[in-house]
């Protein structure tokens, strides 16, 4: 890994981090919409985490749910978030991310600023045209992605229970808790952080400390440009 987040590209890095967080939120809200057994209980677990926040937690969780329990009101809200609010926010953040990238320029593993050596037209001497080199490179990568994506969607949608959990084919039942409430595979690292904290400390409950640990595991990536104090840009 090289210092793609180092000065002067902090804004680009943070913009990418915000995009990642919004995509996680988009994935979570979309996961709840089928209203299957695992979807229901995943929403119950995640939203109830907010209830562990001292003083305001329970009121905040009730406000987000729109009810005292996960219900159709919650589903309608998450549907609006998934279809309207979050996509608009993602498009806006990606737009500003591209603007920042256009202004500052991309990085490279050697940490060399190619803008220091330009020709009479202002084009870096050590650069290559975006077309056809990068265009053909990206088209190839896009083709490989679409091949895998379409193979899963049309021929292997369950993904052996990893893409679509079999238990989620059952309708949501608030009176029957699944034997194991597991997150989608892309949330597994953060869910592991949440479950790893099983002790109370300084008057804070284990549930709250686990929530803080999970949130910190996500937020720490945004602070990388300021945490990395090494004088060497690349590794």
Task: Please identify what each model-predicted range represents.
Residues 1-235:
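Membrane-embedded and interfacial regions of multi-pass energy-transducing membrane proteins
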């Amino acid at each position: 890994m090289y210092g793609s987040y180092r000065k002067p590209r902090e804004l680009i890095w943070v913009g990418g981090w915000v995009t990642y967080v919004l995509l996680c939120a988009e994935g979570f809200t979309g996961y709840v919409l089928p209203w299957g057994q695992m979807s229901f209980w995943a929403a119950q677990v995640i939203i109830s985490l907010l209830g562990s926040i001292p003083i305001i937690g329970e009121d905040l969780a009730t406000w987000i749910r729109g009810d005292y329990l996960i219900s159709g009101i919650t589903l309608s809200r998450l549907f609006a978030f998934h279809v309207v609010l979050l996509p608009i926010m993602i498009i806006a953040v990606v737009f500003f991310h591209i603007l920042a990238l256009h202004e500052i320029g991309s990085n490279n593993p050697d940490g060399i600023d190619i803008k220091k050596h330009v020709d009479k037209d202002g084009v870096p001497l050590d650069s290559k045209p975006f077309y056809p080199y990068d265009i053909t490179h990206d088209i190839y990568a896009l083709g490989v992605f679409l091949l895998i994506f379409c193979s899963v969607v049309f021929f292997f949608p369950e993904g052996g229970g990893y893409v679509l959990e079999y238990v989620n084919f059952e309708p949501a039942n608030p009176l029957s808790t699944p034997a194991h409430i597991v997150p989608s595979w892309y949330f597994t690292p953060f869910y592991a952080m949440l479950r790893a904290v099983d002790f109370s400390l300084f008057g804070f409950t284990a549930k709250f400390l686990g929530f803080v640990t999970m949130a910190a595991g996500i937020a720490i990536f945004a602070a990388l440009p300021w945490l990395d104090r090494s004088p060497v840009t690349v590794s």
